[in-house]
Amino acid sequence: MTRVTIIGGGYGGITIAKALDDVAEVTLVEQKDTFVNHAAALRAAVDRQWAERIFLPYDRLLARGRVVHGTALAVRGTTVSVTGAGDIEADHLVLATGTAYPFPAKHLESSSVIAKARIERAHTNLEQAGRVLIAGAGEVGIELTGEITSAFPAMEVVLLEAGP
């Protein structure tokens, strides 16, 4: 059976892993201990119930394949070197390492425990704040403004944008 190693367990990586799970020997390499639904991360910063919902365990993702928690260090030919797992042989390699944005839009921590603590700290800070300044009126800034004003209607929110 064809061996496919996917580096990155975000939206793209898990989509490919699930699609190939029945037809290939799939290995998904991911640093984080859980899948993070980043689309809901801004809501989680203002709503404690959502903070638990954005973290989904990888253990039920694949029926046949496996998830290796580690960092891909190098690719040499058909071999992927992974921290904590050694070398993984692959016939095909998929790089699905995704993107990085600052917190609270994305959680870059490998441990969901640390990420949940950051969310809780952000929520507590928002509860105690009378006003908030959000720098950047792009998609994330506007969405975060909406989440904050919805969850904390009395909060004064200033959205700062450098461009016209």
Roles of regions detected by a PLM:
Residues V132-E147:
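Short strand-loop-helix active-site module centered on a catalytic nucleophile
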Residues T34, Y101-P102, V140:
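Surface-exposed, flexible loop/turn segments at secondary-structure boundaries
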Residues T2-V4, A63-A135:
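FAD-binding core/adjacent interface of flavoenzyme oxidoreductases
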Residues R53, L73-V75, A137-G141:
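A general structural signal for short secondary-structure boundary/capping elements
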